[in-house]
Regions:
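Acidic, surface-exposed loops and disordered segments
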Residues: 1-212
Length: 212
């Protein structure tokens, strides 16, 4: 874990998490290449199942292509206007060829996207994860091969808004200890008994290293 001791603090990391916002209004200024490269580098270093790194990142800066993608960045009748307005889109695709590992694909891509969001915030850039899209249509626009799947995209640019901090549930509402229902350590809810399904594969015996 060497290489960053003394350069960041736990409090600083937590402050970054708390300060990040989903930005949906952007200035027209282009994103400098050196900042874009750092965002992509953050995604490259995300963990993945067996360190397979199944991702490809498509950087879309061309205005016409961005507009074409934006036409299919919609969920039912909701169209995400900020997709057309952001100066940069990063479309995250995943390799689906391996039948076993494809079950982890969305988790892996989500981790890469999350690291990009945080790096963007650290650089003073605004970003927003967009998951409600027509993946097939966007894949066709961007010539994504059939062996790959569009999982989601990020909008990226300099923010033209400062959203208020979003509400968050307190830990007391979302944390359980040992089993669901124990709100305090040492609660009286006992572990359950498995009554459905078959035991999972013991992956350790298969010498599969899950997270790289």
């Amino acid at each position: 874990m060497s290489g960053y001791e003394g350069k960041i603090t736990p409090a600083g990391v937590l402050a970054l998490f708390k300060g990040r916002r989903s930005i949906r209004r952007y200035r027209p200024d282009p994103v400098p290449d050196e900042l874009l490269a750092q965002v992509l580098e953050a995604g490259r270093w995300a963990p993945s199942a067996s360190n397979r790194q199944p991702w490809d990142f498509i950087v879309v800066c061309d205005a016409e292509i961005r507009q074409a993608v934006a036409e299919y960045a919609a969920y039912f009748f909701l169209k995400w206007a900020h997709v057309a307005e952001a100066p940069v889109l990063i479309v995250l695709c995943g390799d689906t060829k391996n039948r076993f590992y494809r079950q982890f694909l969305h988790e892996d891509i989500g981790l890469a996207g999350g690291q990009m969001l945080l790096q963007a915030a650290a650089l003073g850039l605004g970003s927003c994860w967009v998951g409600g899209v027509n993946r097939k249509a966007i894949g066709e626009i961007l010539h994504v091969p059939e062996s790959h799947e569009v999982v989601g995209l990020l909008t990226l640019g300099f923010p033209a808004e400062e959203p208020e901090p979003p509400a968050r549930k307190p830990l007391s509402q979302i944390v359980h200890y040992d089993v669901y229902g124990n709100r305090q350590p040492g609660g009286d809810v006992a572990a359950g008994r498995v009554i459905t399904g078959l035991p999972g594969i013991v992956l350790r015996k298969l010498s599969i290293k899950f997270r790289g």
